[in-house]
Design a protein with these regions (language model features):
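Membrane-embedded helix bundles of polyisoprenyl
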Residues: 7-81, 89-126
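Short coil/turn helix-boundary motifs
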Residues: 81-84, 130-131
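Transmembrane catalytic cores of multi-pass membrane glycosyltransferases
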Residues: 54, 58, 63, 102-178
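A diffuse structural propensity rather than consistent per-protein peaks
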Residues: 87-90, 132
Length: 178
């Protein structure tokens, strides 16, 4: 019980730190990220379960730490000008996106579903760039690599006799409407 309570504090701290880091990277104002994070922490805009779930130290809430970087790196990729698509920085951004997205799948399928919905929304927002052949090809290859990174260890373990995560079955049943 003590370990779960301690992990709760670490988990909540990292979720808020990742949120602050993403806002600092996306906002031009030096004060807006702090205000946004404080409003999220102190404001109670949704039901109490929205915030209390982070106290449970469940794997799906821990996976939320990696949803935010997935969103950030995808936005950064689409903000890159076409002339800079072949630079090392862009490859690093795509690599970080692949790692963050694959970690959501490796931890819990719940976070992957949220990250996937966010990615669909971002692609819709950057529709013209998303449909551009250069951007589309790069993001699709990165997406395939990120899923492969997460599924490969699970597949090896499954072949070795370890059953798959319960979250995969749950997530697929939610997607299929069951």
């Amino acid at each position: 019980y003590v370990i779960l309570c301690t992990f709760y504090l670490v988990q909540v701290f990292f979720i808020h730190t990742v949120l602050l880091a993403m806002l600092k990277l996306l906002c031009r104002s030096p004060y807006l990220p702090y205000a946004g994070t404080l409003i999220y922490i102190l404001g109670s805009f949704w039901t109490i379960q929205t915030y209390s779930r982070f106290g449970a130290s469940l794997p799906q809430e821990f996976g939320m730490i990696f949803v935010i970087p997935s969103v950030y790196f995808l936005i950064r990729f689409f903000q890159t000008e076409k002339e800079k698509l072949k630079t090392k920085e862009t490859k690093l951004i795509l690599g970080c996106f692949a790692l963050a997205f694959s970690l959501t799948l490796a931890i819990h399928f719940y976070g992957t579903m949220i990250a996937g919905l966010c990615c669909i929304g971002i692609a819709g927002g950057f529709c013209l760039r998303f449909l551009n052949r250069e951007y589309f090809r790069r993001i699709m290859i990165t997406g395939i690599i990120s899923v492969f990174l997460a599924v490969l260890p699970m597949g090896i373990a499954f072949v070795g006799g370890t059953p798959l995560q319960g979250s995969l079955g749950w997530g697929l049943s939610v997607i299929n409407g069951g």
